[in-house]
Amino acid sequence: MSFPSSAASPARSEQAVPEGAAKEPMVTFEGVTKTFGGADGKPGFAALAGIDYTVPKGSITCIIGRSGAGKSTLIRLANGLEKPSTGRVVVDGVDVAALDEKSLRTLRRSVGMIFQHFNLLSSRTAFDNVALPLEIAGLGKKEIEARVAPLLDLVGLSDKAKRYPAELSGGQKQRVGIARALATQPKLLLSDEATSALDPETTQSILELLKRINAELGLTVLLITHEMEVVKTIASQVAVIDRGLIVEEGTTFDIFTAPKHETTRSLLSSSVGVKLPHWVTSGLKQEATDGDRVLVRLVFFGETAFQPLTARLVAEIGPDVNILAGTIEEISGQPFGSLVVSYPASAEVTARANRFYAETGLHTEVLGYVA
């Protein structure tokens, strides 16, 4: 992986991770547990209860979960801020817990980290904040200048190099934090709720920056967040953690469009697809009676997102089709649409509709019945 060496050359799309490289592991958690406390014969708190998970090289991987699920503990294991109680954490082929202090310091230079709170030194300019880890590493003034200037250019802050944190906006402070995290030319970037203190517009600009860094530098990004919009925008894959265990994992698109675990469905319930109004859900039944209408969620993605399937459904089963709600959005760069319709729950209409779904390959979910 190459980092920019001059202010004039941050664009390196040709050096993006080649196809297939993402299958190699950057971080591997092998049977990892972590227990806090437990002194004097008292039981400890199991923050992690047996994690087996791999973060591929070159990926942007998101860990999501409820508060207290173990997200922050998991990410702190990746740079040796915490050690596992049992199991192994392997970063780029190195068992982190097996390292002595000197080797651990070397490893940490290959792992950058950005935080919700920017942790900038108020007495240092943007340039000097980015330079700090290089000064600690013992680099000379000319080498620091050659490293910091292109990084500030990369994050769009060349004109703010001499500004102090108090003179910067929240988004600009986070960009300084990102540049500082990249100063030691890491292979892995850890992000702990890095956008949660930012407004939506600034969040989007930071996400675009992280995507560009990932693409141009081939940098692996592992982030935790409670913001599902962040995950949809940036992640290539997702892992869901609950009570110290990975309960579901997969590509971002698969997790968001077809969540399987109850925890995943709960986390995503308000961020994907259609949320029905209360006046509809309050009258929803799971069994049909004579004269009822069935509510069906139709899911469109890939090529089906651009086909006139709703019009064809009306042509197939008749004009008595009501559209109750609908949305279309982009998840991990792919179109995804969701439409809730109702039509008579009679055997004849249901048979025609089911035949149409089978012929078109349309994904459907029966939500219930209303009078």
UniProtKB/Swiss-Prot annotation:
It is a peripheral membrane protein. It is found in: Cell inner membrane. Keywords: Amino-acid transport, ATP-binding, Cell inner membrane, Cell membrane, Membrane, Nucleotide-binding, Translocase, Transport. It catalyses: L-methionine(out) + ATP + H2O = L-methionine(in) + ADP + phosphate + H(+); D-methionine(out) + ATP + H2O = D-methionine(in) + ADP + phosphate + H(+). It comes from the Bacteria. Residues 1-11 have a biased composition (Low complexity). One of its GO terms (cellular component) is plasma membrane. Its EC number is 7.4.2.11. Gene3D superfamilies: 3.30.70.260, P-loop containing nucleotide triphosphate hydrolases. One of its GO terms (molecular function) is ABC-type D-methionine transporter activity. ATP binds at residues 65-72. Residues 1-24 are annotated as: Disordered. Residues 27-268 form the ABC transporter domain. SMART domains: AAA, NIL. Signal peptide: none annotated. Part of the ABC transporter complex MetNIQ involved in methionine import. Responsible for energy coupling to the transport system. Belongs to the ABC transporter superfamily. Methionine importer (TC 3.A.1.24) family. The complex is composed of two ATP-binding proteins (MetN), two transmembrane proteins (MetI) and a solute-binding protein (MetQ). PANTHER family: AMINO ACID IMPORT ATP-BINDING PROTEIN (PTHR43166), METHIONINE IMPORT ATP-BINDING PROTEIN METN (PTHR43166:SF30). This is Methionine import ATP-binding protein MetN.
